[in-house]
Design a protein with these regions (language model features):
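Terminal regions of secretory-pathway proteins
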Residues: 1-304, 315, 322-644
Length: 644
C-alpha cells in the first residue's frame, strides 16, 4: 500500500461529502422539472415496498455514500488495484477524519430475556450483528468492476446481457402446478423472506422516489440520478415493445456505512366482522374504497395472501396474550406483549425448521448443516462468534426462490369445500379481506391449491405485470438479477465452488445440471460460463432428490438458516440463557404446527396435518377439534418469571 496520510483521508472525505451535496442539488432540480415517480405507477408501488423509516434510510444512504465516494477518491488518487481497494483500505479508519460523524453509533446492551425490536444486542460482543438498518454479511468477496461499487462486467470486460433479456429468453410463463406443495408453502416462503430481509433503496433527500426512466432523462443523461441502474429493454422484446418501453426502472440499494467505520468496498381492526390488522389510510394502497392494513412491514399489503398470514400471526399473538393473562392476572400489558411475542417467535422458529425447511432442503442437507431441532431437552450449541446476520447472497438471490412458486390467481373455498371464487393477486390491494368470510375462504384456498413448481417457469403476473400500470408492469426476475449485480454478487460458478460443487468449465457441462433448453439459452446470452448470474442459474438447477431447491441455492439457504439457528442467543431450544424456556414449556412448543395455528385462529374446521403439503393418504384432513392436530398446553407458563 502507498503511504496514505491523515491529510489524504481528510481530503478524500471532503470530496465524498461534496459529491453527495452535488447529488442533492440534482435531486432538487429533478423535482423542479417534475421528474419524480408518479403516484399509482408501477414504479411507485415498487418503491412503496421499501418505504420504512424514510428519514433514517436517507441518512444511512447519505452516510454510506459519503464513505464510498471518499474511497473512490483514494483509489483514483493513489491508483490502487482492486485488491488494494478491497483489502488495504480496510486498515484506514474514518474515525478522526472530517467524516467521522458518518460512523455508526454503538449502544450499550442491557441484560434481558426478550429480543429487541430491531434485532440489536442479540450478540453481546457484536451488538450490531443481525440488527435492522445494518449491512448484510458476506461469505464471498463482492465482484465489482472497479473493486468498490461499479456493477460486475463480463470476463472479457464487456457488459453483461440485459437482465430483462436473460429473464425473457431463459424464463417462460407456463402454468406448472406443483405435485406436492400447497400455496401455503409458497406463502410461508414469502412471509419468511420478508421477515428476514428488506433491502433499502436510494431515495432523494426531500423524500421523493427517484425516477430513472423518462424521455427527458434519456435525451439529457445529466439528469440521470447516480443511484439509477435501469434495466435495458431490447427493441424486439415480445411484451414491452408494444408499449414502446426501452427502459425498466431500477434504483440501487443504499450504501450502508461500514460497521467497523473503515474505508473500503460497498456493503450492502376489524374487517368482515373478524379480528384483523388495524387499517391505515396513509399507506400506499391501490384500492380507493378500502384502506390497507398496518403491520410491522408495509409489504404485508403487497397482496391479499401476505396480509392474510400477517393477520393469522396477529390473532395468534393476541390469543396467546389472552391465555397468558388468565394464567397470570398480575402481569402488565407490556409483560403480556413481550411474553406473547417471545412465545410466538418460538412457534415461528419451530414451524420453519420442522415443517418448512425439510421440504425445501431435503433430509440430507438438513442433516449436513445440523438444522433439525431436537426431539427433547435443550440445545447448548449457541456460537457467540457466529454472525447471524442475513447473508447478501441469500437476501438478493437464494431467498427469492419463492417467486417461481407464485400462482397467477388465488383460489377461495367455502366451508362445504366448494370453490366459489378466484382472485388475481392485486398490487397493494388487500381489499378482498374486508369482505365477510373472505379470510377463511382464502385460508382454505392456500391449503387446497397447489403452488407452482420450482423451476424456470414464472407467473406472468410477476414476469410482465408486476405492479401493473397502464397495461404493463415490471419484471420481478429481471429486477432480481439486477439486484444481484447491484450488490456485487459473484457469478454462479463461484457459488458452486463455495458450496463444494465442481466448477463448470463450459456451457455443455451446464446442460447436465439443468434443463437443456435453459442451459443453451444461457450459452447464447452469456459470453463465458463464468459470467452467468447466480439468481437465474440457481432457479434453473435440477432439484435435489428429496428437496425443492437445487444444490447451490440449497447450500446458500442452509448456511443462512444454520447461522440463524446457531448464532441466535434467543433460539427457542437454547438452555442456560436468560431467555430459556423450561423443559416442560419446550415440549409444548414442539407440538406446534402451522395447521394448529390455522385451526386456532380461523373458522376453518378441518385441515390436513401438514399444511404445506397437499392432502394425501399419509397427510389426511383432520377435524381441528378431535385432537389429532396437537394443541399446546400453556399451563406451564403459570407464574412464569418475568423481566421488567
Amino acid at each position: 500500500m502507498p503511504d496514505i496520510t491523515s491529510t489524504d483521508l481528510d481530503f478524500a472525505g471532503q470530496e465524498g461529502r461534496s459529491i453527495v451535496q452535488r447529488i442533492e442539488q440534482l435531486e432538487a432540480e429533478l423535482r423542479g422539472r417534475g421528474l419524480v415517480v408518479k403516484k399509482g405507477s408501477a414504479e411507485y408501488y415498487l418503491q412503496a415496498q421499501f418505504d420504512g423509516d424514510r428519514r433514517k434510510v436517507w441518512e444511512l444512504g447519505r452516510d454510506g455514500l459519503t464513505g464510498v465516494e471518499a474511497t473512490l477518491r483514494l483509489v483514483k488518487t493513489f491508483q490502487l488495484t482492486s485488491m488494494q481497494s478491497q483489502e488495504g483500505l480496510r486498515h484506514f479508519s474514518l474515525v478522526n477524519t472530517v467524516i467521522a460523524d458518518t460512523c455508526p453509533k454503538r449502544l450499550p446492551c442491557p441484560t434481558t430475556k426478550y429480543r429487541t425490536s430491531d434485532g440489536s444486542c442479540n450478540n453481546l460482543r457484536h451488538p450490531e450483528w443481525g440488527k435492522a438498518f445494518h449491512t448484510y454479511a458476506r461469505v464471498l468477496p463482492p465482484r465489482y468492476a472497479d473493486g468498490i461499487n461499479e456493477a460486475r462486467l463480463s470476463y472479457d470486460g464487456g457488459p453483461l446481457p440485459s437482465a430483462r433479456e436473460v429473464s425473457q429468453r431463459a424464463f417462460a410463463s407456463e402454468n406448472r402446478p406443483s405435485r406436492k406443495v400447497t400455496v401455503a408453502f409458497a406463502l410461508w416462503a414469502q412471509f419468511l423472506a420478508y421477515d428476514l430481509s428488506l433491502t433499502g433503496v436510494t431515495i432523494a433527500g426531500n423524500g421523493d422516489a427517484i425516477l430513472c426512466c423518462h424521455k427527458e432523462i434519456k435525451n439529457n443523461p445529466r439528469l440521470l440520478h447516480p443511484a439509477c441502474m435501469p434495466v435495458h429493454i431490447l427493441d424486439d422484446d415480445p411484451y414491452f415493445r408494444k408499449y414502446g418501453r426501452s427502459c425498466m426502472h431500477f434504483l440501487r440499494s443504499i450504501a450502508a456505512p461500514r460497521s467497523d467505520c473503515t474505508f473500503g468496498k460497498l456493503k450492502w381492526s376489524i374487517a368482515g366482522g373478524e379480528d384483523m390488522l388495524p387499517t391505515n389510510k396513509s399507506l400506499p394502497c391501490a384500492s380507493k374504497d378500502a384502506p390497507c392494513f398496518a403491520s410491522g412491514d408495509k409489504r404485508s399489503n403487497q397482496n391479499a395472501l401476505l396480509t392474510l398470514i400477517h393477520g393469522v400471526m396477529l390473532r395468534e399473538h393476541n390469543r396467546l396474550a389472552d391465555r397468558l393473562s388468565s394464567l397470570n392476572p398480575g402481569w402488565s400489558d407490556e409483560i403480556l406483549f413481550r411474553e406473547a411475542r417471545r412465545l410466538l417467535c418460538a412457534q415461528l422458529q419451530h414451524i420453519t425448521y420442522t415443517e418448512f425447511l425439510p421440504l425445501l432442503l431435503g433430509n440430507k442437507v438438513m442433516s449436513s448443516y445440523g438444522l433439525s431441532p431436537k426431539l427433547s431437552g435443550y440445545s447448548f450449541d449457541y456460537k457467540a462468534d457466529l454472525n447471524a446476520a442475513v447473508i447478501n447472497s441469500f437476501a438478493t438471490a437464494a431467498n427469492r426462490f419463492g417467486h417461481t412458486l407464485v400462482q397467477d390467481d388465488i383460489e377461495m373455498y367455502s366451508s362445504q369445500g366448494a370453490r366459489h371464487d378466484e382472485s388475481t393477486l392485486q398490487k397493494f390491494d388487500p381489499s378482498l379481506l374486508h369482505s365477510k368470510g373472505s379470510f377463511d375462504a382464502l385460508i382454505r384456498g392456500t391449503l387446497r391449491q397447489p403452488a407452482q413448481t420450482f423451476d424456470s417457469h414464472v407467473s406472468n403476473q410477476l414476469k410482465n405485470q408486476l405492479f401493473n400500470d397502464s397495461g404493463y408492469g415490471l419484471d420481478i426476475i429481471a429486477l432480481n438479477i439486477q439486484r444481484g449485480r447491484d450488490h456485487g454478487l459473484p457469478g454462479y460458478n463461484e457459488w458452486r465452488e463455495y458450496c463444494g460443487l465442481p466448477r463448470l468449465r463450459n456451457f455443455k457441462e451446464l446442460e447436465s445440471i439443468m434443463d437443456t433448453a435453459v442451459a443453451r439459452n444461457f450459452s447464447r446470452l452469456y459470453g463465458n460460463v463464468d459470467d452467468v448470474d447466480l439468481y437465474p442459474a440457481g432457479i434453473a438447477e435440477n432439484p435435489l432428490p428429496d428437496a425443492i431447491l437445487g444444490p447451490t441455492f440449497a447450500c446458500i439457504v442452509a448456511e443462512q438458516f444454520r447461522r440463524l439457528k446457531l448464532g441466535d442467543r434467543f433460539w427457542y431450544e437454547n438452555g442456560g440463557m436468560e431467555s430459556s424456556f423450561s423443559e416442560a414449556q419446550l415440549q409444548e412448543i414442539r407440538k406446534v404446527t402451522l395447521s394448529r395455528l390455522f385451526c386456532d385462529n380461523t373458522h376453518v374446521e378441518a385441515i390436513q396435518l401438514v399444511a404445506f403439503v397437499k392432502q394425501a393418504g399419509w397427510n389426511p384432513t383432520e377435524n381441528c377439534r378431535d385432537g389429532k392436530i396437537q394443541r399446546m398446553n400453556l399451563a406451564s407458563w403459570k407464574n412464569e418469571p418475568v423481566w421488567t
